[in-house]
Amino acid sequence: MRVKTGVVRRRRHKKVLKLARGFYSGRRKHFRKAKEQLERSMYYAFRDRKQKKRKFRSLWVVRINAACRMHETSYSRFMHALKVANIELDRKVLADMAMNDMQAFKSVLESVKEHL
């Protein structure tokens, strides 16, 4: 018995074209180009979700280092002193303190000063 793909194909095409909304030109309107672009965009999304974590961590390190250098110390010495002093603040919190609450960051720096 012959099976035709009319309904299945239409649903599959609609699903791909719906996900391709916002793409430019034929990449939005033509199924084959939309499918190719969608595969590429899904690859980029997967890859960049991993890279996002790395980029934010490096941004936090840069911000903490800048705040440390304002108080005559380096990032590596500061982080080592935190570990020795058994203060468990992560880089995200420290970077936020360095940007928005310099007094709190300075108090943390003073509390680890003896371990520098």
From Swiss-Prot:
Keywords: Ribonucleoprotein, Ribosomal protein, RNA-binding, rRNA-binding
GO annotation, biological process: ribosomal large subunit assembly; translation
The keyword Cell cycle is assigned to this record: no
PROSITE patterns cross-referenced by the UniProt entry: RIBOSOMAL_L20
GO-annotated cellular components: ribonucleoprotein complex; ribosome
GO MF annotation list: rRNA binding; structural constituent of ribosome
Pfam families registered for this protein in UniProt: Ribosomal_L20 (PF00453)
Gene3D superfamilies reported in the protein's UniProt record: 6.10.160.10, Ribosomal protein L20 (1.10.1900.20)
Keyword check for rRNA-binding: yes
Database matches in HAMAP family: Ribosomal_bL20 (MF_00382)
Biological role: Binds directly to 23S ribosomal RNA and is necessary for the in vitro assembly process of the 50S ribosomal subunit. It is not involved in the protein synthesizing functions of that subunit.
Family, as annotated: Belongs to the bacterial ribosomal protein bL20 family.
NCBIfam families per the UniProt record, alphabetical: rplT_bact (TIGR01032)
Stated name of the protein: Large ribosomal subunit protein bL20
Organism field: Helicobacter pylori (strain P12)
Designated gene of the protein: rplT
